[in-house]
């Protein structure tokens, strides 16, 4: 298959699934397997196109991100600030730094991904069933305690297949944060976390890159960016109506497909 077509397909899958609670890792592994694109170059490619998805968040939430560093203000009252983001980053950041190699060796495989797809789906159903009325209906009403709780649930996203958004939105619901506020906080929190993780992986894999890969990587990056923009906007509109449960059942189906086609 032509590199440009692989770039479009993989970029579209990455952009569509990165911020939905369905596990981008599971979809990327499955798609790469079906396309025969799963060597070391493919792993570096996935890191690069993930940056395209991150850029989509930056573009959509640019006013909010500027306000976090003191440039501009989105509301006259109390609002989300940089400390909320730092608090949310600490749990997964510490765990990721301490156990980065072990996580890569133990959890990056078909078996662990199938388990996490199912476990993540169960978590989402449990969160929907046992969540109480929201005390933080908007992003600016999230407390530091709620930010830390969401950050703790983000640790689950270190396990490929759990889904960052699925884990953190579930944590937000259990901490009495609304679906939309939890999702928006999740997307903003993902920017520094994903930039750091992707940057580290890219530095470690730099020697694999070559000039011949630029067209493939550029195609994937641009596709991931455009599709992620559409996916984020659509998901935020959809989430207030359909909740997490349909995504949980989709994860169970994906786990079955993964089991029969990959394992």
Swiss-Prot record:
Its main location: membrane. Its EC number is 3.6.1.27. It is found in: Cell membrane. It catalyses: di-trans,octa-cis-undecaprenyl diphosphate + H2O = di-trans,octa-cis-undecaprenyl phosphate + phosphate + H(+). Keywords: Antibiotic resistance, Cell membrane, Cell shape, Cell wall biogenesis/degradation, Hydrolase, Membrane, Peptidoglycan synthesis, Transmembrane, Transmembrane helix. It comes from the Bacteria. GO terms for biological process: cell wall organization; peptidoglycan biosynthetic process; regulation of cell shape; response to antibiotic. The keyword Repeat does not apply. The chain crosses the membrane at residues 15-37, 42-62, 83-103, 106-126, 142-162, 183-203, 216-236, 242-262. It is a multi-pass membrane protein. It is an enzyme of class 3 (hydrolase). One of its GO terms (cellular component) is plasma membrane. One of its GO terms (molecular function) is undecaprenyl-diphosphatase activity. Catalyzes the dephosphorylation of undecaprenyl diphosphate (UPP). Confers resistance to bacitracin. Bacitracin is thought to be involved in the inhibition of peptidoglycan synthesis by sequestering undecaprenyl diphosphate, thereby reducing the pool of lipid carrier available. Belongs to the UppP family. This is Undecaprenyl-diphosphatase 2. It comes from Bacillus cereus (strain ATCC 10987 / NRS 248). The gene is uppP2.
């Amino acid at each position: 298959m032509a590199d440009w077509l692989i770039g479009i397909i993989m970029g579209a899958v990455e952009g569509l699934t990165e911020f939905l609670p369905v596990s981008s890792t599971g979809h990327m592994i499955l798609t790469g397997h079906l396309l025969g694109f799963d060597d070391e170059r493919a792993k570096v490619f996935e890191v690069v196109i993930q940056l395209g998805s991150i850029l989509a968040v930056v573009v959509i939430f640019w006013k909010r991100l500027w306000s976090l560093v003191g440039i501009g203000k989105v509301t006259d009252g109390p609002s989300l600030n940089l400390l909320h983001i730092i608090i949310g980053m600490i749990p997964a950041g510490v765990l990721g730094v301490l156990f980065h190699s072990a996580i890569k060796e133990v959890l990056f495989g078909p078996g662990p991904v199938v388990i996490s797809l199912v476990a993540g789906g169960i978590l989402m159903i449990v969160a929907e069933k046992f969540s109480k009325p929201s005390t933080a209906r908007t992003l600016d009403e999230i407390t530091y305690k709620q930010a830390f709780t969401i950050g703790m649930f983000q640790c689950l996203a270190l396990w490929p297949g759990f889904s960052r958004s699925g884990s953190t939105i579930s944590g937000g619901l259990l901490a009495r944060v609304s679906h939309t506020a939890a999702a928006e906080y999740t997307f903003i929190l993902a920017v520094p976390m994903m930039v750091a993780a992707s940057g580290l992986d890219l530095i470690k894999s730099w020697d694999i890159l070559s000039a011949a890969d630029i067209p493939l990587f550029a195609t994937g990056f641009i596709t991931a960016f455009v599709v992620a923009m559409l996916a984020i906007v659509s998901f935020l509109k959809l989430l207030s109506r359909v909740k997490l449960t349909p995504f949980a059942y989709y994860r169970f189906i994906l786990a079955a497909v993964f089991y029969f086609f990959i394992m």
